[in-house]
């Protein structure tokens, strides 16, 4: 039964006492909170085990949810991987931990729910519950959920939720129950030196967390055009302060081909507050297959959770989590010499040239608010433009050296004075195995045949990137699948940017088939958590970042297809090294506001991908 909210709910929560809410993510990217009782059980395990070194599948670090709620007997949470695992089906779901003030809705045991078509009540995610509670406490009877990425309004007077596009209504209610657990493990993120374990920071390469990646609010990221942005690589002394992206490997298959990195992505400390929030948006252009069953959609589909917690017969606690990462084949090992260099410094592993993007599916015409990004569906390479020959690209950006320097080629790991390690794998009439050259801007030296092999394993778009310092030659493009980017604006301010409104970016990428530039050409790929909502301040610098993100989207640089480092799922769409703010406030996870250095840092990340203000002048 719905109850009136407390009128004493403050607008800002000054208390340092916090409560923890654990949520799981369904296949459509929607987050669902566990009950307060289950959250208390999970939190006890989490606080007790933080700081320990986890082993994948260790019983000590697997939380059997059936011990807290018998209806959840098939489910366990594996803390090292931040994953909920269903034993009888093998389904894996991401989980996250959010911290709220003790004066918030979760801290008072308040849960808002909506009525599904099957007559069951479904809880909103905790952040929405808290937002609804704050707005109602201010005396707002009709609460618009647009700032959180939802196309709904909630009317407190009539206790209904209305789809703003279809006018379809559902009943809602406000319940008061047990409070969520108070936690002593706040772990407020520091400004510098803290490793980030989010999906954006854990690349789709399946190589685990980056040991030493800078935090989002890091203050000393190098400004463009400094090429040596710190990533997972380690600096070594030398004439050019080059980067050593991996230890010198043992030989397998082709000469000097490094072994593919198959590091366990779960063998690391978990994030403080889970993964980034991925909010649902039922914008009318989205196909019904991309819309979750709740909150309400125009089709009125029933709410269901096919792979999340559900009623089942009780079972015993598991002993292991049967998760297996794919093993590297000999072909992958041979390719690693060219591609692991790029993946190690935060670039997607590309196997061939990018496919020509296909036209978008039939949908309604874009409104005026959409028109500014509709053109981003097209690739930056003009239709029918001839692609240069690979040897021509290498010659264009290099100078041949008569005498090879006394150093290693970091692509094949052989001395520059001896033949290229790819001489038995790459055929070229124009470039011999002993030919050595240096890149014209950064002066780093390589076997030209190694550069050719690296280029041929990429998009072959006429651009080249130095594997040592990341200097870009030409216009770099990525492997992002086809999708849609839309931009909206609303008046609510972001914390730290109270003098302006907010820009909402909605990315939507559907499931599809991988092209020749992806890890498994011809096979399907998944796109979890779309549409994804991201936030920028509507300030001059925020608008500049927006325009550069449009360029990055056009060049297919924002997402790629790879292995999720949080769930281990292969052939799925993952972020590609350009960090986005997916939460509006409470910057506990590093993906919200306030963050005074975010705009400066994302400009540096865009510059590292070759997207600078000069690109705007060329448009």
From Swiss-Prot:
Domain of life from the UniProt record: Eukaryota
Organism of provenance: Mus musculus
Broadest EC class assigned to this enzyme: transferase
Enzyme Commission designation: 2.3.2.27
Tissue-wise expression: Expressed in testis and the CNS.
A molecular function (GO) term: transferase activity
GO annotation terms (biological process): Notch signaling pathway; protein ubiquitination
Oligomer and partners: Homodimer. May form a heterodimer with other members of the Deltex family. Interacts with NOTCH1.
Region (Disordered): 243-271, 283-328, 355-389
Key word Nucleus present: yes
SMART domains given in the database record: RING, WWE
Stated name of the protein: Probable E3 ubiquitin-protein ligase DTX2
């Amino acid at each position: 039964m719905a109850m009136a909210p407390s009128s004493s709910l403050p607008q800002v929560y000054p208390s340092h006492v916090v409560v923890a809410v654990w949520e799981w993510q369904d296949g459509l990217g929607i987050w669902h909170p566990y009950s307060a009782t289950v959250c208390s059980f999970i939190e006890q395990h989490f606080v007790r085990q933080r700081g320990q070194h986890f082993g994948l599948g260790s019983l000590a670090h697997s939380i059997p949810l059936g011990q807290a709620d018998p209806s959840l007997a098939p489910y366990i949470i594996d803390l090292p991987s931040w994953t909920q695992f269903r034993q009888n089906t093998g389904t894996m779901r991401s989980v996250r931990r959010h911290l709220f003030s003790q004066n918030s809705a979760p801290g008072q045991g308040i849960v808002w729910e909506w009525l599904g078509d099957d007559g069951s009540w479904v809880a909103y995610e905790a952040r929405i519950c808290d937002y609804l509670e704050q707005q109602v406490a201010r005396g707002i009877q009709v609460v618009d959920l647009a700032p959180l990425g939802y196309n709904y309004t909630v009317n407190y007077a009539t206790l209904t939720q209305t789809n703003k596009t279809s006018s379809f209504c559902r009943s809602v209610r406000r319940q008061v129950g047990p409070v969520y657990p108070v936690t002593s493990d706040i772990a407020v993120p520091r400004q510098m030196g803290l490793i980030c374990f989010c999906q954006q920071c854990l690349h789709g390469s399946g190589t685990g967390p980056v040991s030493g990646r800078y935090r989002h609010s890091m203050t000393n990221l190098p400004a463009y055009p400094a090429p040596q942005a710190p990533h997972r690589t380690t600096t070594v002394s030398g004439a050019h302060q080059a980067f050593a992206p991996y230890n010198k490997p043992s030989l397998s298959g082709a000469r000097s081909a490094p072994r593919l990195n198959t590091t366990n992505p779960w063998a690391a400390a978990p994030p403080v507050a889970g993964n980034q929030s991925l909010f649902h948006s039922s914008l009318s252009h989205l196909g019904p297959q991309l819309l979750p069953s709740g909150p309400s959609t125009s089709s009125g589909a029933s709410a269901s959770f096919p792979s999340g917690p559900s009623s089942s017969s009780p079972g015993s606690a598991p002993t292991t989590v049967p998760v297996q990462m794919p093993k590297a084949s000999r072909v992958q090992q041979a390719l690693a010499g060219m591609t692991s260099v790029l993946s190690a410094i935060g670039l997607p592993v590309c196997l061939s040239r990018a496919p020509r993007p296909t036209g978008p599916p039939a949908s309604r015409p874009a409104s005026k608010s959409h028109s500014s990004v509709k053109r981003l569906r097209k690739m930056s390479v003009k239709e029918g433009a001839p692609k240069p020959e690979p040897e021509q690209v290498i010659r264009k950006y290099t100078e041949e050296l008569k005498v090879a320097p006394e150093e290693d080629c970091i692509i094949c790991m052989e001395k520059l004075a001896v033949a290229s390690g790819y001489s038995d794998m790459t055929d070229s009439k124009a470039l011999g195995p002993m030919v050595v050259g240096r890149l014209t801007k950064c002066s780093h030296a390589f076997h030209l045949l190694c550069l050719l092999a690296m280029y041929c394993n990429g998009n072959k778009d006429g651009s080249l990137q130095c594997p040592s310092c990341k200097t870009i030659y030409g216009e770099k493009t990525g492997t992002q699948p086809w999708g849609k980017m839309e931009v909206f604006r609303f008046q609510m301010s972001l914390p730290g940017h109270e003098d302006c409104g907010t820009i909402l970016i909605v990315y939507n990428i559907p499931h599809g088939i991988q092209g020749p530039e992806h890890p498994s050409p011809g096979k399907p790929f998944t796109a979890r958590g779309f549409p994804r909502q991201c936030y920028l301040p509507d300030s001059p610098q925020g608008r500049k970042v927006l325009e550069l993100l449009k360029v990055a989207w056009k060049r297919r640089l924002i997402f790629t297809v790879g292995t999720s480092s949080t769930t281990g799922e292969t052939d799925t769409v993952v972020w590609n090294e350009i960090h986005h703010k997916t939460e509006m406030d409470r910057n506990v996870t590093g993906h919200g506001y306030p963050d005074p250095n975010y705009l400066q840092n994302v400009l540096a990340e865009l510059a590292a991908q070759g997207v600078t203000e000069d690109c705007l002048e060329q448009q």
